[in-house]
Amino acid sequence: MPYLEIVLALLVLSFQLGHSDDDSGMCMAKEPCSEAPQQETKVDLYKATDNKYVALIQEALASYEPCQQANCSCHADVLKTDLRPFKGGISEQMVERARSYGTKYQIVDHRLYRQKDCMFPARCSGVEHFIKPNLPHLPDMELIINCRDWPQINRHWKQEKLPVLSFSKTDDYLDIMYPTWGFWEGGPAISLYPTGLGRWDQHRVSIKKAADSWKWEKKKAKAFFRGSRTSDERDPLVLLSRRKPELVDAQYTKNQAWKSPKDTLNAKPAQEVRLEDHCQYKYLFNFRGVAASFRFKHLFLCRSLVFHVGSEWQEFFYPSLKPWVHYVPVRVGATQEELEELIEFFAEHDDLAREIADRGFEHVWKHLRMKDVECYWRKLLRRYGKLVKYEVKRDHSLVEVY
């Protein structure tokens, strides 16, 4: 029986016992209980906080329907939603007005062309890697692909909606999401990944291998985080780590903007930690960076319990991951006390933590394969191409890529 069902059964039983008028055969609180174990469990199953979290998990599971492992169907609704503002078609004027918001690409006669000046060459290269296999099957089209961290087209602007592709956004933006270049190359560059985090296909293998060597029973029952101080949203966890190092190991690393210990909350910068080495911990925290976190998808591969802070920033695959089903949601601005309560709840309910961790791993392993990323790119390009309502003429200021 799943751990959640056991917990719920005990909660119901305790309620029934506490409200029974028939005390025959029962050990009452004021009587000696020779046959009843003094401590049936290490956990107080009747705390209000326990009831709160169990109820949230129960509610999430009751409404959850697993998606099918075919044709990147888990993410189909995201593409439909993103393209809906352009159901009337994409005009040449719309693309021209959008040009300043990203890098211009053309597909003409199954060849790919790009404007000469790419702000982030590795990012453009990552994008082009996913476009290339689709060229033989695509109609002529023009695309404005934003390779910056930040989305571009605010939905509250009164101007015409413009078709700009971005890897990440919030609900305030109308950008069309595409799977980030970082699935192949051009992700965040740190000392451990000097050319930038990429090759999702390879990391899937290496991190899973590390996870296999750190079975749940062997993992350290600690919350873990390593990253730079891109925002103060991360401060409470780092401060909790300093106050309760037996519960949390969260430290700031140095980034390019680091000037003094103030930039790491008055502490010496910690060393960066390989993604594979995260797997030795049971609880892994994810925070947004400038936009959505490149770390997020990798954490699930450790088969550890992922605590995801904030729900504002999205990538194309985020909506398929459900809070309390695949990960533990944490509100932005959670205090040290709130974080401590949440971590301790799962430390006391180890089987429940493991069930969520397993579901998170299985979902990412089955529905965020490289073939799913390629599938999403294919569907995006084909459906976008059908919306283009003008004859695309070769722009000779662009350079041929493929």
Curated annotation (Swiss-Prot):
Catalytic machinery residues: 149 (proton donor/acceptor)
Any one GO BP annotation for this protein: positive regulation of Notch signaling pathway
Annotated TM spans: none
Any single Gene Ontology cellular-component annotation: extracellular region
Pathway: Protein modification; protein glycosylation
Disulfide bonds: 67-74, 72-375, 118-124, 279-302
UniProt keyword list: Disulfide bond, Endoplasmic reticulum, Glycoprotein, Glycosyltransferase, Secreted, Signal, Transferase
Root EC class: transferase
Localization per Swiss-Prot or TrEMBL: Endoplasmic reticulum lumen; Secreted
SMART domains: CAP10
Record's signal peptide: 1-20
Annotated site location: Interaction with the consensus sequence C-X-S-X-[PA]-C in peptide substrates: 120, 229, 256
Protein purpose: Protein O-glucosyltransferase. Catalyzes the reaction that attaches glucose through an O-glycosidic linkage to a conserved serine residue found in the consensus sequence C-X-S-X-[PA]-C in epidermal growth factor-like repeats. Regulates Notch signaling by glucosylating Notch in the ER, glucosylation is required for the correct folding and cleavage of Notch.
Family: Belongs to the glycosyltransferase 90 family.
Protein name: O-glucosyltransferase rumi homolog
Lineage: Eukaryota, Metazoa, Ecdysozoa, Arthropoda, Hexapoda
